[in-house]
Regions:
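Helical element adjacent to the flavin cofactor pocket in flavoenzyme catalytic cores
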Residues: 140-196
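Central helical "cap/lid" subdomain
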Residues: 42, 192-240
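N-terminal Rossmann-like FAD-binding beta1-loop-alpha1 element of flavoenzymes
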Residues: 7-33
Length: 336
């Protein structure tokens, strides 16, 4: 007879979202069980640039960033691990003379986020290292930067484990258990698990977990790639995270003259998370270095690559996360 585990809460997915939810719930003494299809913290949460930003195009995403911001600033105090947070700020750049940046800053200021639209001359005056750039305007927000996502995941994992959270790794969910109209558990490759609440925090797999419950939620995944350019790139440490919204390329300093570069370069079509290639594209690597060089004028298109990786941005069609209880006992927390 297969085992049946009973908990207060089951969380599907042990990425940053699932672990953060487990942390919050376990702080209140609840019995939490996480089901993870691979290893905890080994999915898309590690395949990012570690970005922490407050600049978004919607009130919801701005609010979510505001709510989490203090967590990153005080992470070491609460999780006993330094996330190596570095505040660079963000500078969104465009060569187009439109009012969209003014509209964006109005929204940010409405949400109590200090930001400004800067002209080309103001950008050059503030950061002489960027005087060769050819943008007409930029949005600058001083708050925000990047951290080491691996250390953050480790901090969450160690803390939830010490709180008594159980994690069933290398286990796939293939069915949903119902009692009348309420979701009461999941069927997995390791047996059945039942709980008062099931939370779908499965990242790129969230749509498939939702489908098991009979739901059709428009989750999509977009493939992205990132490179670390070696120190000979000599990228100034004082510059902010630079984002060219026209070319869809971005760059930030990564310490000791290194740079992190990435971007969709106009290609952000949805991909199937089960068939998406995990490797790097040589063509993309060449193109992104060229685009970053032409956009920001602080790196060379022939800069050598120290490290690179690809991953998926789990999201939705409109870039808005889904946080809801679509069925009794079943909560969705995905699309971030």
């Amino acid at each position: 007879m297969e085992k049946t585990e009973i908990s207060d809460v089951i969380i599907v997915g042990a990425g940053i979202i699932g672990l953060a939810i487990a942390h919050s719930i376990s702080q209140h003494g609840r019995n939490v069980q996480i089901i993870e299809r691979s290893k905890p913290g080994s999915g898309e949460s590690t395949k990012t640039g570690g970005g922490i930003r407050l600049v978004h195009g919607s009130e919801m995403n701005i609010q979510l960033s505001q709510l989490s911001f203090d967590t990153w600033l005080h992470f070491k105090k609460h999780f006993k691990i330094d996330p190596y947070y570095r505040e660079t700020g963000h500078l969104f750049l465009s060569s187009k003379n439109t009012n969209s940046f003014l509209t964006q800053v109005d929204l940010l200021k409405k949400m109590d986020i200090d930001s400004d639209v800067l002209t080309k001359s103001q950008i050059s005056s503030r950061w002489p290292q960027l005087s060769e750039m050819n943008f007409s305007q930029g949005i600058y927000c001083e708050k925000g930067g990047y951290l080491d996502q691996h250390r953050v995941l480790r901090g969450y994992l160690e803390t939830v484990t010490s709180n008594g959270v159980k994690i069933e790794a290398d286990t796939r969910v293939y069915g949903i258990i119902k009692d009348k109209n309420r979701i009461i558990g999941v069927e997995t490759t390791s047996g059945d698990y039942r709980a008062d609440w099931i939370i779908n925090a499965a990242g790129p797999q969230a749509g498939k977990i939702a489908a098991l419950a009979g739901l059709e939620i428009p989750f999509i995944s977009r493939r992205h790639e990132l490179l670390i350019l070696e120190a000979s790139a000599a990228v100034p440490e004082e510059i902010p995270w630079l984002i060219d919204v026209d070319r869809q390329v971005h760059m930030r300093p990564d310490g000791s003259g290194r740079a992190l570069v990435g971007g969709f370069l106009g290609h952000d079509d949805p991909v199937d998370p089960d068939t998406s290639s995990p490797g790097l594209s040589e063509e993309w690597s060449k193109n992104v270095r060229l685009e970053a060089s032409e956009s920001f004028r602080v790196t060379d298109p022939e800069s050598k690559v120290m490290q690179g990786w690809s991953g998926l941005y789990p999201g939705t069609i409109d870039y808005m996360p889904v946080i809801e209880e679509p069925l009794p006992g079943f909560v969705t927390a995905a699309g971030f």
